[in-house]
Amino acid sequence: MAKAIPRVGSRKNGRISSRKSARRIPKGVIHVQASFHNTIVTVTDVRGRVVSWSSAGTCGFRGTRRGTPFAAQTAAANAIRTVVDQGMQRAEVMIKGPGLGRDAALRAIRRSGIVLTFVRDVTPMPHNGCRPPKKRRV
């Protein structure tokens, strides 16, 4: 019977550090999804593999406070803090959604020191697709 090949990254090999922290990422893509109820910030490399992510909910905001601009700013700062440590210097920003956290997240990204190559709005616009929700009567 053939000898089993040890798997890379198994605990028997004694490899403790994670693979994600070892990667150096000079350029990446920052995706900001701002809905009315939450803001999710995902940082990927150029090929689309997720390096870091954060949301207003994971930052400790609950209920209606998750949709606030301050929560979006905190989520963006948390997601970017880890990738700056990994050496990210340039990034593209893709913003999606109509939420309040769009501008606040972009402000936090600009303040982080990463050079932004471009900022693109990728909000999906329907060509008269689904019927929108009814208007609120307060």
UniProtKB/Swiss-Prot annotation:
Q: Which UniProt keywords apply?
A: Chloroplast, Plastid, Ribonucleoprotein, Ribosomal protein, RNA-binding, rRNA-binding
Provide ranges: composition bias, Basic residues: 9-23
Superkingdom, natural source: Eukaryota
Alphabetical list of Pfam families matching this protein:
Ribosomal_S11
Region (Disordered), start-end ranges: 1-23
Per its UniProt record, what NCBIfam families does this chain match?
PRK05309.1, uS11_bact
PANTHER family hit by this protein? 40S RIBOSOMAL PROTEIN S14/30S RIBOSOMAL PROTEIN S11
Q: What is this protein called?
A: Small ribosomal subunit protein uS11c
Species source reads Coffea arabica
